[in-house]
A protein has these predicted regions:
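C-terminal alpha-helical cap of glycosyltransferases
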Residues: 301, 321-338
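Conserved nucleotide-sugar phosphate-binding/catalytic loop shared by glycosyltransferases and other
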Residues: 12-63, 69, 142-144, 202-204, ...
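Donor-nucleotide binding loops and adjacent catalytic segments primarily
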Residues: 28-30, 155, 162-240, 270-274, ...
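Acidic donor-binding loop of glycosyltransferase active sites
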Residues: 77-79, 233-247, 254
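A short helix/loop element that forms part of the nucleotide-sugar donor recognition site in Leloir-type
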Residues: 53-55, 150-162
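A short, well-ordered alpha-helix in the C-terminal region of glycosyltransferases
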Residues: 308-322
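C-terminal "capping" alpha-helix adjacent to the active site of nucleotide-linked donor transferases
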Residues: 285-286, 290-307
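Active-site-proximal region of nucleotide-activated glycan assembly enzymes
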Residues: 17, 25, 37, 96-154
């Protein structure tokens, strides 16, 4: 949802009106908070393990397609953008059946099920990474859209109570958090030798908040988009999963220690992590090899070697695609005849 909001902001800056069609999960909170109207449909992902759930999902998809066609008839958009996922499938198909130009975005290093089905008929498919076999004028590598960058480093550090001389490590693992990272970070960073901003997620926060924390250990359940951007601006090193946030890490020119989620679809987080590692911007630790001792050693060595930290930061910055949202917005406006 964050990439879609970034594109919406770029479209709005060009004078376009934007309406979201989504489900009733995160978008039900994020979209209205960002100032955009949201229309909802009922759909669910296609289960690959439960035949009963798969049949139910197909039934809901048929209803979602009919509902999507009705909404598009009412809204009469000049173009539709699909971001992949269980809602984008029926909405994208509805757009094609109504002959509305469709632009797709793919956040991962492979096309998801909905995008694979819709890509042959889409006006443009905007890719975060080059994907083997996806070439030609229909495909364009734009990078993954990210929110606007945070404020300047000095004000961001002041906001988080980080002294000018302190080094800061930012830890996060998605909205629910990442249990392996949460546990390893708390044990590895108990010395208080540097400042830590740790966004642990909803699932683990009640338990972790009961633990004694060293000075300078800032444990948070959640940060909104603006605060998260400031946290990135304030820190010197990131410890995180390797989802779409790798593009935000790169946009801020940050070195990273990445722990890919081992059960991600098509293992795309490992591919994301390799992308940063090959460029010299990240150290990759497989989830099964993450221990507090190894994490403490890796972080201590990095923070003690300022020249290596700076080289990784430069490599990260070279990977950045800060104009991705504007490039995708331009594709949508062109498809819409603007």
């Amino acid at each position: 949802m964050v990439p879609a909001l970034a594109v919406a902001d770029a479209l709005r800056a060009e004078g376009a009106e934007v309406t979201f069609i989504g489900g009733e999960r995160a978008e039900a909170e994020l979209v209205p908070a960002a100032g955009y109207p949201l229309r909802t449909i009922s759909a669910e992902g296609l289960s690959r393990t439960s035949p009963l759930r798969a049949v139910r999902a197909l039934g809901r998809a048929a209803l979602a397609l009919a509902h999507s066609r009705s909404l598009l008839a009412e809204l009469s958009p000049d173009a539709v953008m699909g971001g992949g996922g269980y809602v984008a499938g029926p909405v994208g198909l509805a757009a094609l059946t109504r002959r509305i130009p469709l632009v797709l975005t793919e956040a991962d290093g492979h096309l998801g099920l909905a995008n694979r089905a819709l890509a042959p008929a889409a006006r443009r498919v905007c890719l975060s990474f080059p994907i083997e076999g996806r070439h030609g004028k229909r495909y364009r590598v734009t990078g993954r859209p990210i929110p606007a960058l945070g404020g300047d480093r000095a004000s961001a550090r002041e906001r988080f109570g980080i002294a000018a001389h302190e080094l800061c490590v930012l830890v996060f693992g998605g909205s629910l958090g990442a249990r392996s990272i949460n546990q390893a970070a708390l044990d590895a960073f108990a010395s208080g030798a540097f400042h830590v901003v740790h966004i642990c997620g909803r699932r683990d926060y009640p338990e972790l908040a009961q633990r004694p924390l060293p000075r300078g250990y800032d444990l948070r359940e959640y940060l909104d988009l603006e605060d998260f951007a400031d946290a990135l601006a304030a820190c010197d090193l990131v410890l995180a999963r390797a989802g779409g946030s790798v593009f935000e890490i790169a946009a801020h020119g940050l070195p990273a220690i990445l722990v890919p989620y081992p059960h991600a679809s098509a293992d795309h987080q490992s591919a994301n992590a390799r992308w940063m590692s090959r460029a010299g911007a990240a150290i990759v630790i497989p989830d099964g090899e993450l221990t507090a001792a190894r994490l403490a050693r890796e972080v201590a060595e990095l923070l003690a070697n300022r020249s290596r930290l700076a080289a990784m930061a430069s490599a990260s910055r070279r990977l950045a695609r800060p104009d991705a949202a504007r490039e995708i917005a331009a594709e949508i406006l062109e498809a819409a005849g603007r």
